[in-house]
Amino acid sequence: PAIRMDCRSEDIGIWTAGSSIGAFHAAAVVCRFPDLFTKALSMSGTYDLMRFTEAKEPTDAFRVSSPLHFVPRLDGRHLDLLRTRHIQFVTGEGKWENIGESWRLANVLGEKGIPNFVDSWGPDWDHDWVTWRAMMPKYLDEWTKS
């Protein structure tokens, strides 16, 4: 990735972040490519995308793109490397939030020994850009100090 050239470091850890459906992508890209990405900040995520389809069962394409579906089948080097990564789930519990989405993927990851953490900001934080604008700097600040 160009970031390695820009930072003049071949082994710099690359982090990803996203909110709402972007939280899905942030977590999924770390799970798919642990050789490239080291951390994900997934804010107010939606992880079970089956509810947005008309299909009753996941298709093969779905199984390879959804961490809820492909992580349980991981093994070998890919899983070993993923166990050295970290996914931070952060969510409010206010309007339009569903912390259960974060817990569902966190539990799947935990069953495979993949480091993750769910952090609830409580009922005063809604599924909204104001929430994410407060969340992102907090975690980036913590991560850059560690």
What are these regions (language model features)?
Residues P1-S146:
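Non-catalytic cap/lid and distal C-terminal segments of serine-dependent acyl enzymes
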